[in-house]
């Protein structure tokens, strides 16, 4: 059976969450961490409280504390949320640090690395695909070993693509290893955003979100099948129903 961190959206395993720069990924990620650590609902889904370890590698503790204070409206940060602003790179001690943290906190469910680029070695040997596959594979091995989710915050390329998941920065090696991928689409300064989700253990779907006071709330969601149905013009559905009612068509 699939072990869900967020039912239907985020299972255990390796996950990617990619979006444009300055699109609000870190705010959204911190809110998710708080909700999971407190066992509060996420987008109409009931959450089992778990320890969350958040490597926020582009922030200071003061900035994180200010954001948490704003997100929880002056309340206390949950004990199950463990904040880290530094860690070694992949292959240089990160795996050992994760081992230690998982053994220290027995109910760890989610580890967030924000951002992936901060823990990469930038090794030019072997080519981009091989390096992406090796580094992501090392983290997936840890996620599978402990039955947890490791969520990597990442960037999108600026170039557009017909498939939004092709905009994830790096090679296809990252997507090839990841069990789950989220792509955030947001126009700059817009209060709305879409998150497209795909994964081995879930149906493809799109979440339509709205931001208010740095919290992203769910306005609507649809599966890939529902989205395809909506894309068909009404007159075609009416024609299909008419043909079905008369039994044949001559023209």
Spans of features found by a protein language model:
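Pre-Walker A adenine-sensing motif
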Residues: 1-10, 42
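Post-Walker A helix-loop "phosphate-sensing" segment adjacent to the P-loop in P-loop NTPases
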Residues: 35-49
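Conserved inter-motif catalytic segment of the P-loop NTP-binding fold
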Residues: 5, 11, 47-134, 140-141, ...
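Hydrophobic positions on the alpha1 helix immediately C-terminal to the Walker A/P-loop
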Residues: 28, 32
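Phosphate-binding/switch region of NTP-binding enzymes
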Residues: 16-18, 22, 26-27, 53-55, ...
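Conserved, well-folded catalytic cores of nucleic-acid-processing
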Residues: 36-39, 71-74, 118-122, 142, ...
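Conserved alpha/beta core segments of nucleic-acid transaction machinery
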Residues: 199-250
């Amino acid at each position: 059976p699939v072990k869900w961190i967020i039912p239907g959206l985020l299972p255990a395993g390796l996950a990617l969450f990619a979006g444009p720069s300055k699109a609000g990924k870190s705010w959204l990620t911190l809110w998710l961490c708080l909700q999971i650590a407190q066992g509060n609902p996420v987008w109409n889904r009931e959450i089992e409280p778990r320890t969350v370890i958040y490597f926020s590698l582009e922030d200071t503790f003061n900035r994180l504390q200010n954001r948490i204070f704003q997100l929880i409206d002056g309340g206390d940060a949950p004990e199950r949320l463990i904040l880290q602003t530094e860690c070694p790179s992949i292959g240089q001690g990160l795996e050992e640090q994760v081992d230690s943290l998982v053994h220290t906190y027995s109910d760890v469910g989610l580890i967030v690395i924000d951002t992936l680029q901060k823990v990469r070695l930038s090794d030019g040997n072997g080519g981009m695909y091989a390096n992406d596959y090796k580094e992501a594979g090392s983290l997936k091995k840890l996620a599978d070993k402990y039955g947890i989710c490791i969520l990597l915050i990442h960037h999108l390329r600026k170039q557009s693509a017909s498939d939004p998941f092709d905009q994830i920065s790096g090679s296809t090696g990252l997507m090839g290893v990841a069990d789950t991928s989220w792509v955030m689409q947001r126009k700059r300064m817009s209060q709305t955003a879409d998150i497209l989700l795909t994964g081995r253990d879930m149906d493809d779907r799109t979440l339509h979100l709205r931001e208010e006071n740095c919290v992203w709330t769910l306005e609507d969601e649809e599966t890939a099948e529902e989205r395809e149905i909506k894309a068909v013009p009404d007159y075609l559905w009416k024609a299909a129903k008419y043909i079905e009612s008369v039994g044949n068509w001559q023209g």
